[in-house]
Amino acid sequence: ACLQAGKRPRLTPAPALALKGEGVMAFGCPGGDVIVQAMLQAFLNVVHFEMSPQQATEAARVATFAFPGSFFPNVHIPGLLNVEARIPEHVRTELVARGHNVRVWPDYEFDAGGVSLVCDLPAHTAQERVLAAGADPRRTNYAWGK
């Protein structure tokens, strides 16, 4: 292994911190090439779909391996979209109609990543803060807030 331009990373960590006004969300995920995909889905679940941190981590996921993998043997499967079984059948059918090769993963698939996140949110008064956390059931994760 060496550190050099044009080489693949040995690790793919991608911790993130999202800031908006008084709110803060720290989140991260193990999962190789699925890390950023899983983190984006959890982020959108909280910010756009207004899910709680726990709901956001438990929500059904999709993942693609269309680019060559970061790890030997660098597998890539163009056009394949993995979807957890909780994605409704009519959605999967529409994805196939749009040209995707859909493979159904079991619910809470380990390979869909394991997002953990903590939100520090304003409460009812300016002096109060609320910590809310989510632990992904796909991995051995725990959430602890106060």
Predicted feature descriptions by range:
Residues E89-K146:
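In a subset of proteins, long, contiguous C-terminal domains/tails are tracked
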